[in-house]
Amino acid sequence: MIAIILAGGTGTRLWPYSRNMTPKQFLNLGASQESLFQETSKRLDSLVPPEQIYIVGGDAHEDQLRQQILQIFPDFPIDQLLLEPVGRNTAPAILWSILTIPENNRHDSVVVLASDHSIKNLHSFTHALKLGEKLASSGYIVTFGIKPDRAETGYGYILSLIHI
């Protein structure tokens, strides 16, 4: 499995805590001593080897990305840190990452993760990811989501034909 971590963003929605140079994914907002980006990276530790992780972020945040990923994976291949000169949102970041994957890995399943999610139940996450990988390798497109507790126009909704 290949993992793509989307670590872009300018940090404007969580102002005054986050700023352009310190967006929320680089902040420690939870009980751990790690940033949301580091927590996301760490969730992959037993699932995806560092050489199969790609990180997309803004070139303005190169130092933070490099420092924080090397704290989690000291041998992380820095050439898999993909730096956007200008952010173009989610789809172009995913496409660029996928085009960067070496030819011999292009048949692997790909999981795309936001760097700023807080996931409390690691066991459920790991189970869902392993099951999702199994389904994806059988030709299914898999998406993960949570049941909304209120309407929110800033998010998409999933109409599920199969609930796992």
Regions from the PLM with identified roles:
Residues 162-164:
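Conserved small/polar residues in nucleotide/adenosyl-binding loops
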Residues 123-148:
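Conserved donor-nucleotide/metal-binding helix-loop-beta segment in metal-dependent transferases, i.e.
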Residues 20-21, 127:
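Short secondary-structure boundary/capping segments
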Residues 2-5, 16, 20, 31-111, ...:
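Conserved N-terminal catalytic core of the sugar/cofactor nucleotidyltransferase
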Residues 145-159:
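Proline/glycine-rich low-complexity loops and linkers
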Residues 113-115:
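Active-site acidic Asp-centered loop
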